[in-house]
Amino acid sequence: MMHRVGFNVIGRRSFFTVNARRQVLKSSFMGLKPLQLTALLLAGSAGYLYFMNARSAIHEYVVCPVVRLITPDPENGHKLGIWCFKWGLSPKLYFDKDPESLHVNVFGTTMTNPIGCAAGLDKDAEAIDGIMPTGFGYMEVGSVTPVAQPGNPRPRFFRLPADDAVINRYGFNSSGHDVVYNNLMKRVNKFLNSYFGDKSIDKLSLYKDKLLAVNLGKNKNGDEVKDYLKGVEKFQSLADVLVINVSSPNTPGLRDLQNEAKLTNLLSEIITKRDSQSNKPNALGKQNHKPPVLVKIAPDLTEPELQSIVEAAKKSKVDGIIVSNTTIQRPNTLKTQDETLRNQVGGLSGKPLKPFALKAMKAVSKYAKDSDLVLVGCGGISSGKDAIEFAKAGATFVQLYTSYAYVGPALIARIKDEVAEELKKEGKTWMEIIGEDNK
């Protein structure tokens, strides 16, 4: 009896509380004149549209700083960002059409623009349709390992705001092949079953002129060849591009795979595996699907070591090289004063990485000059000027991540605008400036 009375009392309180709130809201709006109500609705709609526009400065000056403020542990900020992208609480570039000067002819197709999202942002392929529409022409998910693994202990991700940089020692934390495969298959099935889907699209990004790559890693105690072969077998049917990550500084022994003999053997086995599966249809039913294979390398290599990597890429017949991953170096140009912070173990990315990545790109480009290898620039890119520097050094397209985390979605439109403006001044297209400094 007492329980019933208690329940009734609580129920009445809840009822009256809800009713009271409704009355307050009703009286508040009833007091407004039609013109005022219209103005309020228009202001709210305008605010929403402004927030949902990827060109809006609100993300750089309000949203991103607030996220950093409420998430002292950057890893939680990363998770919050992915959650927002996953559930559609993210802006998009509405009605934007990339100019032809930005188009990239690569891998037998055309990408709408040369700005790509690097691996590490969407590790488990959860948020592709939130991230891609902010303006990217290419997106890489992963790194993904065969078996789920937690990575290194936390904290393992550190912000260096004075340098627009971060240090991470994640250690290939991954939900594993099965989870990522299921996430990608759900996207494809939803697309195929959608009444409004453009069935003429033949790219696994599910966008007409954009590419989706899956970045493959190995487990901490996994086999240095078999783990990658498992990745090729699992994701060949779901990727426009496959990326072999042998350059993370946070997995013991991984960078040893950049040795010419080891790398040649690994990449040759991967190409053999890919070719043996090319007679199978991909997830969209396309026959003879043979995604290009890229290898991602470190910037912390000598010129002879970079030359050896290019030779390994040529011998194994992979399609290209991503230059580069994060650096283990700590340049004396860092503005961060906290010695403990700046000397955290892990890979440094963001603006301070650019000189190392660009130097490596120039060396790789020099030795890849007489080949068909596609070079991809990655490391410290945060402006149109940066993107053009990498292109002139030999990059067919570029990737970024850290600058996107600091500035927000508006960065992509800004970079594309800056590149298009500079190309117009020079009277050239993006394709015409690739490798210009090496000619």
UniProtKB/Swiss-Prot annotation:
First-listed, main subcellular location of the protein, grouped into a coarse class: mitochondrion
GO MF terms, alphabetically ordered: dihydroorotate dehydrogenase (quinone) activity
CC terms in the record's Gene Ontology section: mitochondrial inner membrane
Transmembrane segments: 37-53
Requisite cofactors: FMN
Family matches, as Gene3D superfamilies: Aldolase class I (3.20.20.70)
EC number, UniProt record: 1.3.5.2
EC top class named in words: oxidoreductase
Pathway per the UniProt entry: Pyrimidine metabolism; UMP biosynthesis via de novo pathway; orotate from (S)-dihydroorotate (quinone route): step 1/1
Catalytic residues in the record: 248
CDD domains: DHOD_2_like
Domain of life where this protein originates: Eukaryota
InterPro entries associated with the record: Aldolase_TIM, DHO_dehydrogenase, Dihydroorotate_DH_2, Dihydroorotate_DH_cat, Dihydroorotate_DH_CS
GO biological process per UniProt: 'de novo' pyrimidine nucleobase biosynthetic process; 'de novo' UMP biosynthetic process
Protein residues bound to substrate: 123, 168-172, 245-250, 325-326
Keyword terms, alphabetized: Flavoprotein, FMN, Membrane, Mitochondrion, Mitochondrion inner membrane, Oxidoreductase, Pyrimidine biosynthesis, Transit peptide, Transmembrane, Transmembrane helix
Cofactor annotation remark: Binds 1 FMN per subunit.
Record's bilayer topology term: Single-pass membrane protein
Protein family membership: Belongs to the dihydroorotate dehydrogenase family. Type 2 subfamily.
Name of this chain's protein: Dihydroorotate dehydrogenase (quinone), mitochondrial
Annotated source species: Candida glabrata (strain ATCC 2001 / BCRC 20586 / JCM 3761 / NBRC 0622 / NRRL Y-65 / CBS 138)
Gene: URA9
